[in-house]
Amino acid sequence: MNTPLKSALCLLLAGAAFGTPSGLNNIPTADTVPHRTVAVQYFSSFGGANQFGTGEPGKSGHWMGFKSGWDFEPIHLEWGMDSPLGTGVSGPLFFQTKARFSPWEDGMFAIGIAGIALTDIDRAGDPFSYAMLAHDFGFARLHAGYGYQTNGSSYLFGVDRTWKLFGRNFNLNTDLAQTRDQRGLITAVGAKYDLTKHIVLETWANFPDRDAVSLIAKINFVFTF
């Protein structure tokens, strides 16, 4: 069943959280993957309709992808691909990229595009273009921006903060995005933890204004070259 909420999320958030520690939950950020670093990701969804749901609400969905970063001072570039997996219909394969620079100390600005279908174009939906601004105030980082997509545009807001837990980074965050062509809202609360130098764990809960709560679990395998 392709519910309206699920359709809106798939369109709106196709590029927002497709998969790396460089974003929050349901929104992109101005962060980029570090230079010559690759993050290979596997993530699953549980519960209600969400942007990673490949079946009916209540059934889990599975995705796999990667992202990499290149630095061309003062511009930092990120690019990647991901795709839903399944025993039935898999795909489409999506491409996304963004470029970031720092306009002032502790500030970042990025423009990007996501959800560019390389396969199964007819059932993939339109790409999602966005601009994001971030500033680190010390007590927290604030994120704000706007994403454009046919019938799926959204203002995007987020807050995050990182602490040390057992000597490794532990991040708590929340974000807010619009759904249903700016007539609905979805809030998410999540956490990230650097389990090792090469493994980053992520999880978050989605709280839409309609439909049931859903959960996302993700593991990132990070290495440099």
Regions found by a protein language model. Give the residues of each.
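Cleavable N-terminal export/targeting peptides
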Residues: 1-24, 225
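Transmembrane beta-barrel domains of Gram-negative outer membranes and organellar outer membranes
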Residues: 19-129, 136-138, 162-171, 175-179, ...
